[in-house]
């Protein structure tokens, strides 16, 4: 904070630290502003809407400014140096009154309009003429927020689904839409209500109505025919049905099927495959989309992918790329032999499996296709139109699919030098007819690798054949379903296993880096406030053979079923990431480095946004598991012994959590640089030496204190339901290193 006497009169400070004259009080003010965004879908009778915020970016954050604000007599100084904060996500508990929200503190940034406007929408206008987002009316260095998420709307049996992007310039625009200043000591609240994608549609249709330049995205509209699906980053498929009458009508009009592909931030033209193919691919990779016809069965259920045919093998003549398949339909429009299906409404049809490759590029650095890179997508339609800037597409699609990116918490700036691992996004097991559904898995991995889950998967495959794995009560088969029989020989061999079940050590990495990954990819995507013993829990399978259950709702808790309660019912499969390589058979680098001689651990391969890099020393304030207080220090030293050594004294769990126990008061010669670890730091200490933290406590409390209190370790990570059960224990102190 900063402050000054507004009158300019002399201020006398007494030896007691008080101001001699009450008329000349120094009034302090915050040098930053507080900005809050709430985002929700509009409610309307007869329409079902949902919006889920994926990430938010804060652009043009001022890097410098005055200590004292722009008071009378001071010249207005506009920020020249700015930077960006990209790819932020919100937590599972960041919901109030049904709306998602986030709050940030931003430095003052005073900026002047470029051109006057008369509406909120015009503030975000970029005239749609630039390949990059360059605003026409807003100042070039004005602070703005980019909201990215998924919108879905159902009305009268027709569903629209959109990956949308909203741009919101900050400033008090309620009093003046030309106002872009972010002033210190002010609170700004922006309530965003997503009421539809119509403005995006207007852009795409190029109608003479006012478009909404602050909103962009891909808009799909599908109704009685066809479907749109979101698929995960592993190997996927979707069965599509094509009607003979449709291609015959297109052919009469001198056209064929339209398609468009989005990948790696670029997209093809809207390509028409008829007598000739029109439209450019623009160097966009389309090889990840393939078709096969034999024994495919389409499902009318819009949430069901259908029954795929067997993958014929990458070198099989039965496999088509996009253009050759659509050309095949065009060329055989009148050939009744291929249109083997029939229904009474639409006539003859052909069912084909669209095989989607894993979202992995062996010819690129892995940072080029993970996390918040634009998702890749594929659309097949009779009619497609795009906005003039190419940023929005409106398609009355017959079929459309969007594929998630692999999510990782590893430092993407080191993609050229380290092998990482990433995870899928969707919990495929929820609501699916796996044998583990309801009862959970009784299966323990046959592997004994505590780090590399793929090594354990290979041991499991060695023990059981594929047929037995499909029928037993395990989640191994769930991970096998993420892989593909690439050579078409009828089995998934060792060199075809790309996706595997994590070890506990790998789950800990995902927990440490939760903030880095998308909102949808978080292992626990519900609220902890409603947790009960049996409800709202999300239990994941681990390939660590003595800890096969990971409790995602508790952040870091484990057990071993069936020797303990709670069988795992979900699994979040992993994929190893290595630049310019297929990478699947490389062991991922550990995300931490431990110096044995110095007893120091450094999270040197974790994205720094997941870490506490401040280097601040001393005890932590009270905090919960998903708050900033539970970010682990990037580097810290682990004490050689615990206190008290005999689990006696005042180190109860409650006293540690609420700060009555302090490391500097009891340990290491009163050095105030030592402190109690938070929960994530204690998880890292488990990776180094589990025995060191046996019956040890941490500073972090659980966000639902009525459900669980805090954490400890007794052969597995566990949580207390009552303080009295943990009246004595110990603490392994740490010292943060800069």
Locate each region found by the language model.
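Tryptophan-paired
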Residues: 1, 10-29, 34-184, 308-311, ...
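Short beta-strand elements
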Residues: 1-19, 161-189, 386-432
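Intrinsically disordered, low-complexity repeat and linker tracts
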Residues: 182-232, 574, 581-596
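Surface-exposed binding patches on compact interaction domains or structured appendages
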Residues: 231-349
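Active-site microenvironments of metalloenzymes and redox enzymes
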Residues: 383-484, 576-670
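An exposed tryptophan-centered "aromatic clamp" motif
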Residues: 476-485, 494-498, 504-576, 657-675, ...
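Acidic carboxylate motifs that coordinate Ca2+ or other divalent cations, activating on Asp/Glu
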Residues: 489
């Amino acid at each position: 904070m900063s402050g000054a006497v507004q009158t300019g009169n002399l201020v006398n400070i007494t030896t007691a630290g008080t101001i001699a004259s009450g008329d000349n009080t120094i009034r302090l003010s915050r040098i930053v502003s507080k900005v809050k965004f709430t985002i929700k879908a509009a409610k309307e009778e007869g329409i079902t809407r949902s919006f889920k915020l994926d990430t938010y970016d804060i652009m043009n954050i001022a890097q410098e400014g005055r200590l004292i604000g722009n008071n009378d007599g001071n010249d207005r100084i506009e920020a020249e140096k700015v930077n960006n904060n990209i790819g932020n996500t919100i937590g599972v508990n960041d919901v109030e009154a049904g709306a998602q929200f986030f709050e940030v503190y931003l430095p003052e940034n005073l900026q002047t309009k470029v051109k006057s406007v008369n509406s909120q929408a015009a503030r975000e206008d970029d005239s749609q003429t630039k390949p990059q987002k360059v605003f026409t009316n807003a100042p070039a260095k004005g602070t703005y927020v980019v909201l990215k998420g998924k919108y879905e709307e159902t009305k009268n049996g027709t569903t629209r689904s959109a990956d949308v992007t909203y741009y919101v310039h900050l400033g008090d625009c309620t009093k003046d839409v030309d106002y872009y200043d972010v002033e210190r000591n002010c609170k700004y609240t922006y309530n965003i209500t997503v009421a539809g994608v119509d403005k995006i549609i207007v852009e795409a249709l190029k109608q003479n109505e006012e478009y909404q330049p602050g909103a962009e995205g891909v808009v799909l509209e599908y109704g009685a025919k066809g479907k749109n699906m979101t698929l995960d980053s592993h190997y996927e498929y979707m069965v599509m049905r094509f009607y003979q009458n449709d291609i015959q009508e297109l052919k009469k009009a001198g056209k064929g099927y339209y398609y468009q592909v989005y990948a790696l931030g670029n997209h093809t033209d809207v390509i028409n495959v008829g007598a000739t193919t029109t439209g450019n691919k623009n160097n966009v990779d389309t090889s990840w989309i393939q078709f096969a016809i034999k024994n495919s069965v389409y499902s009318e259920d819009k949430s069901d992918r259908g029954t795929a045919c067997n993958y014929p093998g990458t070198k099989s003549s039965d496999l088509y790329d996009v253009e050759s398949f659509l050309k095949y339909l065009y060329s055989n429009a009148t050939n009744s032999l291929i249109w083997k299906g029939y229904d009474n409404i639409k006539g003859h049809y052909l069912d084909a499996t669209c095989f989607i490759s894993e979202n992995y590029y062996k010819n690129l650095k892995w940072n080029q296709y993970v996390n918040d890179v634009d998702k890749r997508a594929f659309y097949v339609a009779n009619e497609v139109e795009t906005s003039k800037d190419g940023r929005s597409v409106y398609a009355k699609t017959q079929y459309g699919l969007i594929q998630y990116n692999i999510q990782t918490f590893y430092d993407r700036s080191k993609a050229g030098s380290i092998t990482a691992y990433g995870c899928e996004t969707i919990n495929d097991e929820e609501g699916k007819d796996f044998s583990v559904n309801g009862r959970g898995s009784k299966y323990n991995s046959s592997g004994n690798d505590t780090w590399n889950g793929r090594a354990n998967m290979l041991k499991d495959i060695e023990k059981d054949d594929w047929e037995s794995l499909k029928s037993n009560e395990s989640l191994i088969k769930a991970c096998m379903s993420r892989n593909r029989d690439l050579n078409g020989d009828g089995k998934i061999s060792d060199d075809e296993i790309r996706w595997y079940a994590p070890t506990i050590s790998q789950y800990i990495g995902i927990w440490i880096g939760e903030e880095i990954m998308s909102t949808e990819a978080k292992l626990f995507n519900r609220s902890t406030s409603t947790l009960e013993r049996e409800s709202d829990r999300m239990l994941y399978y681990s390939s660590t053979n003595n800890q096969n259950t990971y409790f995602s709702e508790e952040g870091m808790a484990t057990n071993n079923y069936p020797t303990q309660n709670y069988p795992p019912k979900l699994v979040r499969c992993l994929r190893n990431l290595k630049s310019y390589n297929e990478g699947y058979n490389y062991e991922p680098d550990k995300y931490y480095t431990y110096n044995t001689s110095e007893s120091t651990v450094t999270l040197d391969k974790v994205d720094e946004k997941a870490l506490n890099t401040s280097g601040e020393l001393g005890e932590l304030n009270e905090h919960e598991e998903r708050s900033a207080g539970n970010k682990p220090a990037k580097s810290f030293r682990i004490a050689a012994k615990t206190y008290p050594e005999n689990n006696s004294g005042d180190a109860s769990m409650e006293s540690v959590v609420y700060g009555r126990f302090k490391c500097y008061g009891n340990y290491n010669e009163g050095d105030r640089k030592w402190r109690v670890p938070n929960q994530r730091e204690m998880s890292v200490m488990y990776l180094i030496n589990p025995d060191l933290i046996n019956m040890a406590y941490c500073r972090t409390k659980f966000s639902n204190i009525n459900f669980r209190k805090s954490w400890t370790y007794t052969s597995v990570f566990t949580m207390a339901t009552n303080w009295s059960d943990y009246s004595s224990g110990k603490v392994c102190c740490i010292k943060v290193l800069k």
